[in-house]
Amino acid sequence: MVMADGPRHLQRGPVRVGFYDIEGTLGKGNFAVVKLGRHRITKTEVAIKIIDKSQLDAVNLEKIYREVQIMKMLDHPHIIKLYQVMETKSMLYLVTEYAKNGEIFDYLANHGRLNESEARRKFWQILSAVDYCHGRKIVHRDLKAENLLLDNNMNIKIADFSFGNFFKSGELLATWRGSPPYAAPEVFEGQQYEGPQLDIWSMGVVLYVLVCGALPFDGPTLPILRQRVLEGRFRIPYFMSEDCEHLIRRMLVLDPSKRLTIAQIKEHKWMLIEVPVQRPVLYPQEQENEPSIGEFNEQVLRLMHSLGIDQQKTIESLQNKSYNHFAAIYFLLVERLKSHRSSFPVEQRLDGRQRRPSAIAEQTVAKAQTVGLPVTMHSPNMRLLRSALLPQASNVEAFSFPASGCQAETAFMEEECVDTPKVNGCLLDPVPPVLVRKGCQSLPSNMMETSIDEGLETEGEAEEDPAHAFEAFQSTRSGQRRHTLSEVTNQLVVMPGAGKIFSMNDSPSLDSVDSEYDMGSVQRDLNFLEDNPSLKDIMLANQPSPRKTSPFISLRPTNPAMQALSSQKREVHNRSPVSFREGRRASDTSLTQGIVAFRQHLQNLARTKGILELNKVQLLYEQIGPEADPNLAPAAPQLQDHASSCPQEEVSQQQESVSTLPASVHPQLSPRQSLETQYLQHRLQKPSLLSKAQNTCQLYCKEPPRSLEQQLQEHRLQQKRLFLQKQSQLQAYFNQMQIAESSYPQPSQQLPLPRQETPPPSQQAPPFSLTQPLSPVLEPSSEQMQYSPFLSQYQEMQLQPLPSTSSPRAAPLPTQLQQQQPPPPPPPPPPRQPGAAPAPLQFSYQTCELPSAAPPAPDYPTPCQYPVDGAQQSDLTGPDCPRSPGLQEAPSSYDPLALSELPGLFDCEMLDAVDPQHNGYVLAN
């Protein structure tokens, strides 16, 4: 049986599973599919997870049954409720609660981060649900934004207990599973762990995601992500309060024993700022022992009895926890009653156990059945009717299974495969009237959002295509159901003939600087409606002022921080308001002014898949070895790999112009490295990522291939290092030259001589000495340069003497110094006797006798840059300065010293980095 191609108002979906009409597909997986169903009796929407047991092995089948066992034990307002379990020979049907507003992942991707007040309310709900699970010795092990759903009142519902397990206090678990960005470090290391501590870490990541709109630990590959998690360092944005930062840091502790417990989290200062009101229990929670008849909701039992459902069988089903049709109808009716009562203020609610049975309520229920009025138990303050847009609803392929499951496909479509009891009546569709409430509080808790891929557990690899969703929307425009795609607020836009209502938001918070995105629940379905000209014409025609055009068409509230930007840039930043640019925290030591802190927006990331045996990457690390991991290499080779295409000037230019770049240009920032280092790495990260994409084994620690340019840089760097270790002859030559040039003796200066000499007490020390080895920038070249002998600004140089020779004019330099290859070590100079006259020196210029009363040397405050050739000019980063007058008035008897292969001296240090425009070095004065 397949779905008919006729209009939906002629045939309401012929596909049925038990009492449920299948209305659409929420998600698909390899062995399961999640369908949107509606109960024929209660008219309640449910999510039906249909599992093909024939495609599962024993291990996965056991995991499915354990998930069912766990969900049967859980009954919490912030956990997805299990209504019914139906099983045939080859199929398993899990009927669960349906969260209309989808994943909080999608909400954050569309609306950006939450303010701390809203994040605190959400986190209290998550904390209460996890505490409830831990109290029943159940650990979730896969808490993430994709598994946190939002109901019609924007309350949290935890879903997907497929990775859940039971634990005992003091006993460790040994199975490693979870989602990598949310997994604790002990899971990556393959250690045994305690279940509650694992959930505490995941909740810390979730809280960070709620407040920041980005992941604290992220990486392009699993090994990089693993390394960042094991380091445990993450970035704290400027807008995060100190109390929130303290709480997150105490939860994301590498040592599991030092993490906060749930009781400590509840008592934390940040959590106590706003404590939620404890709502009374609408119906009693099932205890471990069998409940008595009086503990069930008598009002629901009477309503079921009026529908012709045997009350005794219902009670037996509830006591036996059979989760059959009787229990499902009971649970669904209880949920409708809860939805009805939740519309009233908390102070006016009473516990069901404290109330006497109301005859007026019973008469109201009876009138609802006799007169035929709908029993409207939905919240009257609902500001939005959920859209009935069902993606893939009219396609036959929406019910497709794997090729081997074709027989099972027809099995779950036949109603006869599931036994259903006979029911005399049913409730009518709970469609409340459209309410235009001007006094509603503009809070996300009153808002709803229609999502294309809403659902319980989206197991498909890809999301729904917006183009397909638009086709589905166009195909359902003629249906009889009302589609409300936006908030029902002050101004309505009615599409004639279609029965659909669009709304224009007239909230002043769109223009308020203090707005924290309270109005940020605009439907994602309208993203593809922007291309519909008829919709735009209708909306523009119904608007009294053009001021409302921009917020509605752009579908994003105005970011107050981006008021000064142009409309194009404002649209980019409003999509995810975590693109903060100013205001630094003292605890965030790695932030640099002018660099945007986050670029890994949730809207740019794919959903995180849960992974079994997450510690396999640890085994690969042990097999391959740490040398294959580029992140484990020392800092110098890492920068050699990543920094060869980014000069230092370009970094400064990028920092100056970063505020004018669009959001997509900035690199993703590592929480563990300085921004300059990260920027240098990002320049070569793109080609390495392309190579990783071509080779799938790059995912596991394999080093990306180096280019020839990178290998040449490393080779040249190694040659330079060897050359610097063997330049004693060059230092000796400079030492001899400085001794001969002591033409401006200063009696007040007594500077040390080179270590090789032991001068007599009467000998005057030369005013120049080299106290540190030559700069690594020195490298022989094939050209000559002019060298000025005035070096009075370098008064701390210490040079070594050359071997004595009898020639007054020597050859310029030994030939081995003119070669690129490292020279052999020179012979040591002969020792000098104390008191002996200094040997004749080798100079390439004539010596001269100086007058006895020489004027003192002029003071040179700043070093001057000597004229060099083009190749060496790039090596010099000292500032240019004009030659001082004292140099211009020097005696003309000095010939300029022409040294081959000799660049200028610099009192500088070399940063251990590679720069192609500076011949492989980045110099700092």
UniProtKB/Swiss-Prot annotation:
What's its catalytic activity? L-seryl-[protein] + ATP = O-phospho-L-seryl-[protein] + ADP + H(+); L-threonyl-[protein] + ATP = O-phospho-L-threonyl-[protein] + ADP + H(+)
Q: Which UniProt keywords apply?
A: Acetylation, ATP-binding, Cytoplasm, Endoplasmic reticulum, Kinase, Magnesium, Membrane, Metal-binding, Nucleotide-binding, Phosphoprotein, Serine/threonine-protein kinase, Transferase
Q: Where is the composition biased (Polar residues)?
A: 765-774
PTM (free text)? Phosphorylated at Thr-175 by STK11/LKB1 in complex with STE20-related adapter-alpha (STRADA) pseudo kinase and CAB39. Phosphorylated at Thr-484 in response to insulin in adipocytes. Acetylation at Lys-53 inhibits kinase activity. Deacetylated by HDAC6.
**UniProt xrefs under Gene3D superfamilies:** Transferase(Phosphotransferase) domain 1 (1.10.510.10)
| Any one GO molecular-function label of the UniProt entry | ATP binding
Q: What does this protein do?
A: Serine/threonine-protein kinase that plays a role in many biological processes such as fatty acid oxidation, autophagy, immune response or glucose metabolism. Phosphorylates 'Ser-794' of IRS1 in insulin-stimulated adipocytes, potentially modulating the efficiency of insulin signal transduction. Inhibits CREB activity by phosphorylating and repressing TORCs, the CREB-specific coactivators. Phosphorylates EP300 and thus inhibits its histone acetyltransferase activity. In turn, regulates the DNA-binding ability of several transcription factors such as PPARA or MLXIPL.
Q: Which residues cross the membrane?
A: none
Please give the residue positions where the record annotates the modification Phosphoserine: 534, 587
Record keywords: Membrane included? Answer: yes
Phylogenetic lineage = Eukaryota, Metazoa, Chordata, Craniata, Vertebrata
Q: Name one GO biological process term.
A: microtubule cytoskeleton organization
Which positions fall inside the UBA domain? Answer: 295-335
Q: What is its main location?
A: cytoplasm
Which positions carry Phosphothreonine? 25, 175
PANTHER family linked? MAP/MICROTUBULE AFFINITY-REGULATING KINASE, NON-SPECIFIC SERINE_THREONINE PROTEIN KINASE
Q: What protein name does the entry list?
A: Serine/threonine-protein kinase SIK2
Q: Which residues carry this modification: N6-acetyllysine?
A: 53
- Region Disordered, as annotated, extends over 564-586, 630-674, 742-776, 800-895
Q: What class of enzyme is it?
A: transferase
Q: Which cofactor does it need?
A: Mg(2+)
Q: Where in the cell is it found?
A: Cytoplasm; Endoplasmic reticulum membrane
Q: Where is the composition biased (Pro residues)?
A: 821-833
* Active site, renumbered: 142
Please list the residues that bind ATP: 26-34, 49
Q: Where is the Protein kinase domain?
A: 20-271
Enzyme Commission code(s) on record: 2.7.11.1
